[in-house]
Amino acid sequence: MGNLATVGCRSDWFGGLYVQTTTVVTLPNGIATLTASASTAVGAVRHVNEDSFVAESPLFVVADGMGGHERGDRASQTVIRVLTDLLPEGSIPTPADVLSAITAANEGVRQLTAEDGHRLVSGTTLVGVALAQANNGATTHWMVFNVGDSRIYSWDGRLLEQLSVDHSAVQELVDAGAITHAAARVHPERNIITRAVGAEDLVDADVWLLPVAGAQSFLICSDGLTKELDDDDIAGLLAAHGGAVPTDPDAAEQPVSIADALVAAANRAGGKDNITVIVLESSIGGASLDDERTQERTFLAEHLEQTRPRA
């Protein structure tokens, strides 16, 4: 396999940090090209970026350190460091390997709390997708996972679908029918999450598998994006921009990738929190979203119905 990849962590300036990666991986069902753009910015209000990310195969992950808590930035950095140490660039882990790495990341964040004398709990969200093998390497899957209210979406060129379920107080109210999704966006408890890496001795992540097939695209983000832009806004930007690959890398004053464009739009909308975005595009055998949009949408919907985590 070949790759060109870079790890991104935090950035403490408004312009943020931009990363572009491309990886070519040989899988049982063909040659896969993985293209990711990632961007992070501190936002327009805060002074420290507590988000961290990695965008290199096999990991495409965002961690959002718990704002207002001790060591929020160190918590998110610890998660990314542990995951990349245990699931190194170029590897294709098993689902058990990924789960073990998430457990180790939780232990690493718990250690931060212990080092601080347990005055305050360190914690972070975690969301992402990993390229994982099963059946002794005979099959390959996307292993999706999340803890907290950072999100992962699928994008087929027209339809943006949230795959993860927020672990938050307002999501529980929505699930109970007490409030609408629109009301949840402005609810006074919208920043309260019900799960976090490092919050408890055992981490409870939602995890499920999707097939790696044809042309696929994922959006992975911290809530700094989704609290400034609704899903329609995000879908509009994805459709207008067209993909992860920079459209005009020589235009220094303009966003050069869809991830950069999304971060810039969230900043313009208020930028009240740190903002981190990864857009991952996967293609096997040269497939494109235009070629397989309808087929992929139907297949993904059916597979998600069978595999989505349930309470």
Regions found by a protein language model. Name each.
Residues 1-311:
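PP2C/PPM-type serine/threonine phosphatase catalytic domain
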